[in-house]
Regions:
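Conserved ATP-binding N-box helix of the HATPase_c
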Residues: 32-56
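Conserved beta-strand-loop-beta-strand hairpin that lines the nucleotide-binding pocket
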Residues: 1-4, 49-125
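Bergerat-fold GHKL ATPase/HATPase_c domain
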Residues: 1-41, 84-85
Length: 125
């Protein structure tokens, strides 16, 4: 199956759409309900992190792809412009929140902050 890619405006009200899309992908890959709930929570936490950095993003892009070792999920802030309007979210705290929810987590960052969250959910059954 091809990867699922969804791009939405980088606004808090669109996080629900990303959570629902991730839940749908989880159902397609027959992941257990507890994994589905962990993924939805991880998506929400990742969005919170990406929406509170030293930049303003125009869009958030969610990519989900099934692999042998599990469901790979990438959430990226796209079309970023610098702005220091608020205190950025702490990447270390975000990682601590995400680690118990997912099999693996990696945060991509540069001088303006975290711009991509890579996660792997456990393989089904």
């Amino acid at each position: 199956m091809k990867p699922m890619v969804l791009t939405v405006p980088a606004k808090k009200e669109w996080v629900l759409v990303l959570r629902m899309a991730a839940a749908g992908v989880s159902a397609l890959y027959d992941l257990p309900v507890d994994v589905l709930e962990d993924l939805r929570t991880a998506i929400e936490e990742s969005c919170e992190l990406l929406l509170h950095q030293d930049y303003t993003a125009e869009t958030l892009t969610l990519k989900c792809e099934a692999r042998k070792d599990g469901l790979h999920v990438c959430l990226s802030a796209m079309e970023r412009t610098c702005c220091c309007a608020e205190e950025p979210a702490d990447a270390d705290i975000a990682r601590l929140i995400l680690q118990p929810l997912v099999k693996e987590v990696e945060l991509e960052q540069d001088e303006s902050g975290v711009h991509c969250v890579h996660m792997t959910m456990p393989a089904r059954g």
